[in-house]
UniProtKB/Swiss-Prot annotation:
An example Gene Ontology molecular-function term: L-methionine:thioredoxin-disulfide S-oxidoreductase activity
Chain ranges passing through the membrane: none
Function: Has an important function as a repair enzyme for proteins that have been inactivated by oxidation. Catalyzes the reversible oxidation-reduction of methionine sulfoxide in proteins to methionine.
Protein name: Peptide methionine sulfoxide reductase MsrA
């Protein structure tokens, strides 16, 4: 089993896509990249942390490359600290890696993707230093709150688009 930690907008959206994916064993939303011991409130108030999803996956069933391809389909890697109406550093596009092999794969992936995108890809690649699990009410948010307004307006259409691709 391997982990990759991705940030690309609201962590509810990213998790909702990946928790349904064959080969993904578990997802967990959290915070990384900022001050120690964050809370949702401190992240929203600019403590430097990014909303991320830790994806635990079986590399025999799904590759990191496949995960990154999907990641780039579900968020805008050319948008600086903004995804849709969500604005702020906590929505930064980032790949946190745990080993050099994953770093190189991510770098090569972005280089190849840049040939396709007309705008500059701003997704950062950074070694994971610290990761903090988010509050329990954020975990598997879409599954637990499918009728919530944000879920219906933002997450559900994203899932429908991915399923139709």
């Amino acid at each position: 089993m391997k982990n990759i930690i991705l940030g690309g907008g609201c962590f509810w959206c990213i998790e909702a896509v990946f928790e349904r994916l064959k080969g993904v064993i578990n997802t967990e939303v959290g915070y990384s990249g900022g001050k120690p011991n964050p809370s949702y409130e401190s992240v929203c108030n600019g403590d430097g942390n990014i909303e991320v999803v830790k994806i635990n996956y079986d590399e025999k069933q799904i590759s990191l490359l496949e995960i990154l391809i999907l990641f780039f389909k579900i968020h805008d890697p050319t948008s600086i600290d903004k995804q849709g109406e969500d604005i702020g550093i906590q929505y930064r596009s980032i790949i946190f890696y745990e080993n050099e092999e994953d770093k190189i794969l991510a770098q090569n992936f972005i280089e190849e993707q840049q040939k396709i995108f007309s705008k500059k890809i701003v997704t950062k690649i950074s070694r994971l230093q610290t990761y903090y699990k988010a509050e329990n009410y954020h975990q598997h948010y879409f599954i637990n709150n499918p009728d919530q307004g944000y879920c219906q307006a933002v997450i559900a259409p994203k899932l429908q688009k991915i399923q139709s691709d």
